Curated annotation (Swiss-Prot):
This is Homogentisate 1,2-dioxygenase. It comes from Legionella pneumophila subsp. pneumophila (strain Philadelphia 1 / ATCC 33152 / DSM 7513). Pfam families: HgmA_C (PF04209), HgmA_N (PF20510). It catalyses: homogentisate + O2 = 4-maleylacetoacetate + H(+). Hexamer; dimer of trimers.
Length: 416
């Protein structure tokens, strides 16, 4: 069961009477609870993008204890001098017999001043272990397996083809439902993700607000030992407390985790000719200080009909002002016939040329242009700042050193 609607002011209580009926902070909360506000923006942000929630807890967060350095380097150093070459990786993970939870399975791929991208692998649930990110919100894009995200606000269920966002500072743990789970993770330290403006598209289309789902209140009331791991200023810290941090019995507000089924994305595409720009596939965006230039765009290339007439239908050859990190959830990407599979990654930074490989080009340039259904789901994390690649990703054996060869079949066909 979920609450529906992106950015709505929701309220939920796991025990009847836990929510104060007429105010936020009564002198004495009912059921012996404590009132605590969680702010996602400054108090004085305009009303339409002011984010906060009130939580009614068994114990306030100040009782969590003292944090100490945690011996795990989640942030990895970047390559000092990064070439303008296109880069691509095969999936980093194979199945492991070693127990590995969500935090232990994080692999830092690349970053920019306000955005970082990781992959995750886990085959073991976080039973009495919790995670929070003070540096930014987390966008989950799974490509294999199923997980449940148990958060301070309630539970989200997540599998391939769906996404979830955990806001900055919200504590959660990952329960692995399948044998193992794999996915992509994007950390956004800029403005919180929101729905893009639709412009001439109109009032409806792309990701509709009604399809975003928020958790109903659920709580843990355990007196055993619990470990909280917190990412703060690019480092991990831990504390051990004698209660679960997921002790919120009721809440109300508009700052909360949410999930979304990508199959509900209302895809906009041409019904005449040419390939529209990929901005029409934007699901969520983090606005920067420059209008129309995003700190982060989350873009998908979902299952869709291709019907353009007298047109080269795959994505065109391109050199871009923005910086692209791509992944594949399932299927075969229509611009890459080989080498780009679920779990893979490609990075094309500002002005780095990219486009269909030679085999894809040959097929698309000569095919009979009947309506064609593309049954795949690729995505892109697009930023205004260069993706700096970590040393561990740059030197990882899954990096395809021969990636540029996919364009070497092109030959001069110009004639006067």
């Amino acid at each position: 069961m979920y609450l529906q609607g992106f950015g709505n002011y929701h309220h939920s209580e796991a025990v009847k009477g836990a929510l104060p009926p007429n105010q936020n902070s009564p002198q004495h909360c009912s059921l012996g609870l404590y009132a605590e506000q969680l702010s996602g923006t400054a108090f004085t942000r305009p009303r339409h993008n002011n984010l906060r929630s009130w939580l009614y807890r068994i114990l306030p967060t100040v009782t969590q204890g003292t944090y100490y350095p945690y011996e795990f380097n989640i942030m990895q150093p970047f390559v000092d001098e990064l070439s303008p070459n296109a880069m691509r990786w095969s999936p980093l993970y194979n199945s492991s017999q070693i127990k590995c939870d969500f935090v232990e399975g994080l692999f830092h791929i690349a970053g920019s001043p306000l955005v970082n991208t990781y992959t995750y692998y886990c085959n073991h649930s976080m039973s009495d272990k919790y995670f929070a990110n003070n540096d930014g919100e987390l966008l989950f894009v799974p490509y294999a397996g199923e997980i449940h995200l148990h958060t301070e606000f309630g539970k989200l269920m997540l599998s391939s083809g769906s996404i979830a966002v955990i806001p900055r500072g919200v504590k959660f743990k990952v329960e692995v439902i399948s044998k193992e789970a794999k996915g992509y993770l994007c950390e956004n330290s800029g403005n919180p993700l929101t729905l893009p403006q639709l412009g001439p598209i109109g009032a409806n289309g792309l990701a509709n607000p009604r399809h975003f789902q928020y958790p109903v209140a659920a709580f843990e009331n355990s007196g055993s030992e619990h470990t909280i791991i917190c990412k703060n200023q690019k480092k991990l810290w831990f504390t051990v407390c004698n209660h679960s941090p997921l002790n919120v019995v009721a809440w109300h507000g508009n700052y909360a985790p949410y999930c979304y089924d990508l199959s509900l994305f209302n895809t906009i595409n041409t019904v005449s000719f040419d390939h529209p720009d990929p901005s029409i596939f934007t699901v969520l965006t983090s606005e920067s200080e420059i209008p129309g230039v995003s700190n982060l765009d989350f873009v998908i290339f979902p299952p869709r009909w291709m019907v353009a007439e007298h047109t080269f239908r795959p994505p065109y050859f391109h050199r871009n002002y923005m910086n692209e990190l791509m992944g594949l959830v399932y299927g075969e990407y229509d611009a890459k016939k080989e080498g780009f599979i679920p779990g893979g990654i490609s990075i094309h930074n500002c002005m780095t040329p990219h486009g269909p490989d030679y085999e894809s080009y040959e097929i698309a340039a000569s095919q009979d242009l009947k309506p064609n259904y593309i049954n795949s789901l690729a995505f892109m994390f697009e930023t205004k700042d260069y993706w700096q690649v970590t040393e561990q990703a740059y030197r990882h054996p899954s990096r395809q050193m021969d990636y540029l060869n996919c364009w070497q079949g092109f030959k001069i066909e110009f004639s006067q």
